[in-house]
Amino acid sequence: MRARFFIAFVAFLLLATSCASRKKTVAPAPPQSFEWLTANMAIQAEGNGMVYNDLSGQLRMRKDSLVWLNVTATMGVEVLRVKVSNDSVWIVNRIEKTYLAEPLDTISAQLGMPLSLPLVQTLLLDNNQGLPPVENQTVQLKTFVMGELSAKIRYNNIRLNEKTTFPLKITDKMERIRLLKKQ
């Protein structure tokens, strides 16, 4: 009797679930809007024939206002500080004891392409919406202070607001985007 009841129950479950309509997958979440963003990063960089694996960084960003990046080595020694505002860029290189304070217009002219704070934020957030179209151009990233540097950045924790914290692993596509001076 038990065996018949079990077989009937399994048959009923199969019939009840097999004929159901297929549910649609959930649509991707819309892009998050934020006022302030804080992200911790693990950075692997190559430059001057060396590989730097033990770099970490903190990115702070206020939408349409400010980008602040601190890069530290082991034991919390600050290596690089970058601040980008609406009209200027400040870069402090603690290793070579140099700094750069220039208007965005000057750096844009040196790169030979338009550069603005919304563009920098778009590149850092890997948000392709709003990027100016690049026509048949190869672009290479070269820093003014650190020399040639290729970096892979992993964001560990991103806080969009104080209430929203979630761990993410975002591969930063900036390594593929390279800015070149026009020659």
Tell me what each language-model feature is.
Residues A27-N48, I170-R176:
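Transition segment at domain starts
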Residues L15-S18:
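C-terminal motif of bacterial Sec signal peptides marking the signal peptidase cleavage site
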Residues M61-R62, V84, V134:
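Generic beta-strand structural signal
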